[in-house]
Structures are given as C-alpha cells and as structure tokens.
Amino acid sequence: MTSSAAAIPARRRPGRPRAGDTVPDREQLLEAAVRIIRSDGPEVTMDDVAAAAGVSKPIVYRNIGDKDALVAALAERFVDQLDEAVERSSAVGVGGRATFVASMRAAFEVIDADRNLFLFVTAGGPGTESVRRLVDRSSSRMIEQFTALRTAAGLDPLPARTWAYATVGAIQVVASMWLRDGYGDRDDIAEHITQLMWPGLTTAE
C-alpha cells in the first residue's frame, strides 16, 4: 500500500457528523424546528428543519423521528405554552365568568403570538395523534374546573367532559378560521366563545 493510499480518509456514512462536529441534541433540534416554523410558516419540511439545525436529515430522524413525531413533540410544547398562559390568567382569583373569559383571552393571545406553530401542530386535523394528544392535555384541566364549578353550584357534573372537549374544539376551529380570515379582535372572539359556553356551564337545563 502506498503512502498516498494510506492517507485517504474513511468515507463518512450518510447522516453521520463530520469529525469534530458537535451534533445537536433532541432539544436543540426541536428549537431549530420551532425557529424555522415561526419564520417560514407551517408548511416547512423535514429538509427545512435539518437545514435550520445545520445537520443532515438522518440525524433529525434519529433524534426526533418522522414528521408525525416532530408534530407530536411540538404539540406538547404548544400545550405547555397554553397551560402556562391560562394558569396565569386564572391566578388573579376573580372566579366565575370573568376567569373563564380571561382564560379564553389568554389562549387566543398565545395562538396569535405563535400562529405558525399553532397551524403546524393542528394541520393534520382531529384524526391525527398529535391533535388528539393536544385535545386530551388541553381538556384535562377544563374537565376538572367544569366539574368543580358544577358541583359547587349543586348541578350535575356529568356534562363537564363533553363541554371541555367542546370548548377546546371551539378554540381550535375558531382560531384556525380567525387566522385565515383575519376577522374581529381576539378579545372579542374570546368574549363570543364565552357567551356561547358560559350559560350551559352554569345552568341546570
């Protein structure tokens, strides 16, 4: 074997980092995905995410999974944002209708501020795993709150689960149409949803 032949480096396998490269971890890859979605819109591809992270697509797949796994992971993050905002809005301790409408306003504020991420995680529709998980997490707190509200008022708590799902569904669909058509003020939209939902929550009929 000649010295020149011995100097030829081993070929790097696809998806493997170059020598000396630092491979982003899963959290850093998710951050890169969020950045590119926020800047380029909800139609970004896995190739776009890889480019934003400065890695090959196989590295993204190895650390996150496929597109569905990415959507599911970012849906969890988005629900965390919603939960934090709604919890802050409820911490004022006013209670009743004022707290309900404040939570609706908080949800729409988060959606408005991060609209591309919202559209990305809800793009698959209600039949997708990511949206089902989003609904389950978003509604769990409402089920507890609606049950407590009805019980404290001496009313049947049975409808609480249905109304929680209905409220989450209303937020999702109304927000999608609002972002698409740009109609109305977000606080007015929150008030409109409250006008529809609140009477059922607080009456026996």
Located regions from the model:
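Basic, helix-initiating cap at the start of DNA-binding domains
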Residues: M1-A52, D68-A72
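C-terminal peripheral helix-coil segments that are non-catalytic and often amphipathic
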Residues: M1-R13, E144-T151, M177-E205
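Short hydrophobic clusters on alpha-helical segments that form packing/core surfaces
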Residues: L29-I37, F78, L82, A107
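Short hydrophobic/aromatic patch on the recognition helix
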Residues: G54-I64
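Hydrophobic alpha-helical connector segments
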Residues: A73, E87-A113, W163, T167, ...
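Amphipathic alpha-helical segments used for helix-helix packing
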Residues: F108-S130, E144-T147, S176
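Amphipathic alpha-helical packing segments from all-alpha helical-bundle domains
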Residues: T128-A152, R161-Y165, D188-E191, W198
